[in-house]
């Protein structure tokens, strides 16, 4: 019987050598990231070290279970990697329990619901239309189908959370779980008010801090952990790690339930290469310079929104306390779907986004969402974000004047974007 011999280059060939077709895709995406200004609030740019860990030999290792209690042998080194991630996360957020295994923020939220509520129970979260997230009980999501999901919103006058409505809904529906946090809410959330309401009706209180976790880690945003029974987050966005999820708590009983919900409840083997990359990112976030970065993210968001407002746009809620903002396009009689495409042709990446009380359909929208984490990672400061705000206004004014044939304004802005991106390169040598 002939023994198998790996084909030539199996252990040595690069992607370019082994798969030129895919290599072209990777090169094109690298160029896109290098040449476009990334303003999508949920995206960031990881360090070379995080990239290296995510592409490491740990991708080969199956490790069902938890450190010291695996269902496979050979887990000595991945145990160390996972423990590093856990201990660094505990240090970052000042908590006693962390699970770093969720593959995503949605998986982290799903694990909380599997652990703490039953199908048919009532949960309460911010509506998608008000800036919440799909996984907080939106009708199309699993959480909206499996649970009796009650949704609260924001006030018409200032687009801030309507705590009178939150209290009334909680008293009326007696939810088992109340959720704070969202994907398009730019203001600091009053966690103490939520805690008070949850205690009044006997509910557990969960905070999804996926968007602002990096600001919390830097000490520049109030931490939800003193108030919430359970906290979930992604590990990318402002935390600037690989794409993934995490669950945190100071309640050991809840921690045991979460561990069982993550594995074997929702997932099998954890992605050990991603957990290693999380450990690297958490180590970076523990450095003093990360606080400087996080402060710059906040300062840059204010500079960007000031420039957009000066250009005749409305900023939902009047501004931002965080890394993101919602821009109301109605003063220029534009819609988010058209603006997103025009800005992308100018090499500025945003996403169309509904605004509170939006009259447009979700596929159209009256707004766009912008964020500063990725641009700040490149090195953009307030001067650059002021310029970026002006470039956005230039594209939008062209759209308002010329309709969808906005090629002249897009070309002019694209040239200015190229100059800016060349000044702040990323991933040299890749």
From Swiss-Prot:
Keyword Amino-acid biosynthesis carried by entry: yes
Sequence positions that bind (6S)-5,6,7,8-tetrahydrofolate: 128, 132-134
Main location: cytoplasm
Cofactor(s) needed by this chain: pyridoxal 5'-phosphate
Pfam families in UniProt: SHMT
One Gene Ontology cellular component annotation held by this UniProt entry: cytosol
Gene Ontology molecular function terms on file: glycine hydroxymethyltransferase activity; pyridoxal phosphate binding
Residues flagged as site, Plays an important role in substrate specificity: 236
Location in or out of the cell: Cytoplasm
Keyword set, alphabetical order: Amino-acid biosynthesis, Cytoplasm, One-carbon metabolism, Pyridoxal phosphate, Transferase
Matching InterPro entries: PyrdxlP-dep_Trfase, PyrdxlP-dep_Trfase_major, PyrdxlP-dep_Trfase_small, Ser_HO-MeTrfase, Ser_HO-MeTrfase-like, Ser_HO-MeTrfase_PLP_BS, SHMT-like_dom
Functional note: Catalyzes the reversible interconversion of serine and glycine with tetrahydrofolate (THF) serving as the one-carbon carrier. This reaction serves as the major source of one-carbon groups required for the biosynthesis of purines, thymidylate, methionine, and other important biomolecules. Also exhibits THF-independent aldolase activity toward beta-hydroxyamino acids, producing glycine and aldehydes, via a retro-aldol mechanism.
Subunit relationships: Homodimer.
Protein name listed in UniProt: Serine hydroxymethyltransferase 2
């Amino acid at each position: 019987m002939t023994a198998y011999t790996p084909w030539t280059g199996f252990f040595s060939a690069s992607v370019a050598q082994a798969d030129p077709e895919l290599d072209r895709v990777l090169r094109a995406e690298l160029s896109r990231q290098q040449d476009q200004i990334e303003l999508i609030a949920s995206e960031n740019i990881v360090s070379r070290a995080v990239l290296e860990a995510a592409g490491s030999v740990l991708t080969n290792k199956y490790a069902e279970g938890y450190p010291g209690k695996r269902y496979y042998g050979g887990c000595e080194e991945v145990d160390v990697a996972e423990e590093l991630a856990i201990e660094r996360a505990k240090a970052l957020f000042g908590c006693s329990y962390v699970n770093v295994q969720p593959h995503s923020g949605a998986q982290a939220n799903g694990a909380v619901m599997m652990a703490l509520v039953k199908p048919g129970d009532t949960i309460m979260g911010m509506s998608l239309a008000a800036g919440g997230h799909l996984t907080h009980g939106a009708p199309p999501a699993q959480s909206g189908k499996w649970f009796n999901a009650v949704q609260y919103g924001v006030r018409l006058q200032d687009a801030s959370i309507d705590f009178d409505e939150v209290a009334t809904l909680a008293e009326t529906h007696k939810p088992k779980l109340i959720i704070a946090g969202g994907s398009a809410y730019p203001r600091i959330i009053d966690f103490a008010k939520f805690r008070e309401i949850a205690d009044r009706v006997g509910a557990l209180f969960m905070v999804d801090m996926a968007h602002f976790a990096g600001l919390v880690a830097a000490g520049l945003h109030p931490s939800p952990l003193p108030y919430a029974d359970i906290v979930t987050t992604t590990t990318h966005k402002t935390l600037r790690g690989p794409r993934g999820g995490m669950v945190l708590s100071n309640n050991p009983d809840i921690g045991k339930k979460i561990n069982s919900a993550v594995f074997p409840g929702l997932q099998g083997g954890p992605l050990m290469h991603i957990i290693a990359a999380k450990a690297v990112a958490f180590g970076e976030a523990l450095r003093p310079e990360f606080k400087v970065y996080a402060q710059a993210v906040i300062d840059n968001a204010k500079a960007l929104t000031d420039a957009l407002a000066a250009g005749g746009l409305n900023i939902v809620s009047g501004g931002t306390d965080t890394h993101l903002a919602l821009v109301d396009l109605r003063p220029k009689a534009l819609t988010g779907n058209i603006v997103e495409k025009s800005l992308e042709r100018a090499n500025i990446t945003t996403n169309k986004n509904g605004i509170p009380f939006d009259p447009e359909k979700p596929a159209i929208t009256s707004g766009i969402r912008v964020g500063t984490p990725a641009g700040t990672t490149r090195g953009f400061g307030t001067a650059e974000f002021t310029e970026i705000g002006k470039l956005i206004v230039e594209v939008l004014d062209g759209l308002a004047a010329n309709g969808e044939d906005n090629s002249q304004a897009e070309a002019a802005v694209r040239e200015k974007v190229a100059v800016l991106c060349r000044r702040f390169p990323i991933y040299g040598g890749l």
